[in-house]
Regions:
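Bacterial signal peptide processing site
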Residues: 22-24
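C-terminal motif of bacterial Sec signal peptides marking the signal peptidase cleavage site
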Residues: 17-20
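Aromatic- and acidic-residue-enriched segments that line the glycan-binding/catalytic groove
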Residues: 96-111, 146-157
Length: 157
């Protein structure tokens, strides 16, 4: 009787082992890996809106020097507060805050659509240079569909 019990237990154990090893279910294991090296860089950015003079320039028609001073003030603030990127709106309403052969100069920059800053400078070029001097990436923000904003005054022909 004991022999029969031992034999039955041995056969059952072998069958159980065979069945357990032949399962069709996939098993997943979770492992934790130690992360070494550098951490991915954070994108700490600020949007700088130009439509309706929301952030820059503070109003249309400022002198070139006033526009530059305000831009430097914003970039210094971002640098002081550890931002590493700025997103500058350069095409607020079918116009441009940079030299363009396709779009007129922005009303929000000079107070008259189509009028270049005087004395002349390219605001986008200025922003890129000043941002990079502070270790800040500059990204452009284009509004491809806004034809006109209610604060944009008259549209040039």
């Amino acid at each position: 009787m004991i022999r029969h019990f031992i034999r039955a237990t041995a056969v059952s154990s072998i069958l159980l082992l065979i069945v357990a090893c032949s399962t069709t279910q996939k098993t997943t294991t979770t492992s934790t890996q130690k992360v070494t090296g550098s951490v991915m860089k954070e994108f700490r950015a600020a949007w700088i809106a130009t439509v309706a003079n929301i952030n820059w320039p503070s109003k249309p028609g400022l002198s070139t020097e006033e526009q530059k001073r305000e831009a430097i003030e914003l970039l210094d603030f971002l640098q002081k507060h550890h931002f590493n990127a700025a997103i500058l709106q350069v095409r607020p309403q079918c116009d441009a805050l940079y030299k363009s052969d396709l779009e007129p100069w922005s009303y929000y920059l000079t107070g008259k659509q189509g009028q270049a800053p005087s004395p002349y400078y390219d605001p986008l070029e200025f922003w890129v240079e000043e941002a990079h001097n502070r270790g800040i990436e500059l990204h452009v923000w284009l509004n491809p569909y806004r034809a006109h904003h209610k604060d944009g005054k008259e549209i040039s022909e």
